[in-house]
A protein has these predicted regions:
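Conserved, mostly hydrophobic/aromatic
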Residues: 58, 263, 329
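Conserved phosphate/anionic-ligand binding catalytic regions in large, soluble enzymes, centered on
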Residues: 54-67, 325
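Glycine-rich phosphate/diphosphate-binding loops that line cofactor/substrate pockets in enzymes
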Residues: 43-51, 253-257, 351
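Active-site-facing alpha/beta catalytic cores
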Residues: 2-5, 72, 85-240, 244-245, ...
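N- or domain-start disorder-to-order transition segments that initiate the globular core
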Residues: 7-46
Length: 351
């Protein structure tokens, strides 16, 4: 008899179950309050019951937890300064989609050396999320792998489905059962209809195969997620202008979806030039100041230090500097947050 399975699997290593990790690192009362309130507030902003703007801001990816906590402490201070205008959520990304190959993130390879200590990565990721939430600062992340949410989702206030996975059925099913609001990005080439389709799918109940926190295969029955929205991240060209907002709103309206839009200032909208986020921010603040209410959120790729660096020389990494996409620095981040807060105040005065 011929062997017909696992022909291209060279090894297998079991990982800790989600239930074991959650037992070892339980969510605190403080963190649960942070997550609960942030999800409620985001939902209200999305549905325009709250006049503020949601801002998901932080490093492209997390590779150094000390720098991440340093950043979180700074961001918490800013969130208190602008609590009447902005709902600030820290971008805490542990998984990186790759166009071909490359470092897949802290969970997959926490030591940055291709050792793939995923147990360690899951533990580090969960501990960091606990620490950030205990500060009273909510965390947002991209759900790339459909199993890892079992390990961290109770500590996530907002989630994203990326441009490469918005069309994926399993990610739409995941979103439909998610306890937190979910943003779907437009496609890598800029198409918004796929995101509208994803929102429409996630609104509905689904039955799908997944893995329980104990590590057993099971059929999950989701009830649908009413707190889903589109994220404009650009594509073959930027899509944050007023004309793009109008076009996106028309697509949402024609699909009987709420005209609530988040703009990603990075990626295709910055033409992958991190300083261009400041140009995008200026345009968005002008729109908001003029009374644009359909923009309910923004995303910013930001770090302590500007730009990015290679992770090949681990002994000489610059503290607080990205090893994936280039980010704006902390001073520019504060400028953006101030501009956004002033724009929200101006919009409120018009209303």
């Amino acid at each position: 008899m011929h062997k017909t399975s696992d022909l291209r699997i060279s090894d297998r290593q079991e990982v800790i179950s989600a239930s074991s990790l959650l037992s070892d690192q339980p969510i605190s009362k403080e963190s649960s309050e942070t997550v609960y309130q942030a999800r409620e507030n985001f939902s209200k902003i999305l549905n325009k019951e709250d006049h503020r703007l949601s801002v998901v801001v932080g490093p492209c990816s997390i590779h150094d937890t000390l720098a991440a906590i340093d950043y979180a402490g700074r961001l918490k201070e800013e969130s208190l300064n602008y609590e009447d205008q902005l709902q600030i959520i820290m971008r805490v990304y542990f998984e990186k989609p790759r166009t071909t190959v490359g470092w897949k993130g802290l969970i997959n390879d926490p030591d940055l050396n291709d050792s793939f200590q995923i147990d360690k990565g899951l533990s580090i990721a969960r501990q960091l999320l606990r620490d950030i939430n205990d500060l009273g600062l909510p965390a947002g992340t991209e759900f790339l792998d459909v199993i890892t949410p079992q390990y961290i989702a109770d500590l996530i206030s907002w989630g994203a489905i990326g441009a490469r996975t918005t069309e994926s059925q399993v990610h739409r099913e995941l979103a439909s059962g998610s306890s937190c609001p979910i943003g779907f990005k437009n496609s890598t080439y800029g198409g918004v209809q796929v995101a509208a389709d994803a929102i429409g799918s996630a609104l509905n109940p689904h039955k799908f195969l997944s893995v329980t926190k104990e590590g057993r295969a099971a059929v999950f029955y989701s009830s649908g997620n009413k707190d889903c929205h589109v994220i404009l991240r650009g594509g073959s060209k930027p899509n944050y202008s007023k004309e793009d907002i109008d076009a996106t709103a028309e697509i949402l309206k024609s699909n009987n979806l709420a005209e609530s839009i988040m703009v990603d200032m990075s990626h295709g909208n910055s033409s992958k030039q991190h300083k261009n986020q400041l140009i995008v921010c200026e345009d968005i603040t002008n729109q908001i100041s003029s009374g644009e209410s359909r923009i309910t959120g923004v995303m910013i790729e930001s770090n302590i230090e500007e730009g990015n660096q290679s992770a090949k020389d681990l002994d000489n990494l610059v503290y607080g500097k990205s090893i994936t996409d280039a980010c704006i620095n902390w001073e520019d981040t504060k400028t953006c947050l101030n501009q956004l807060a002033e724009a929200v105040s101006a919009r409120e005065n018009i209303a």
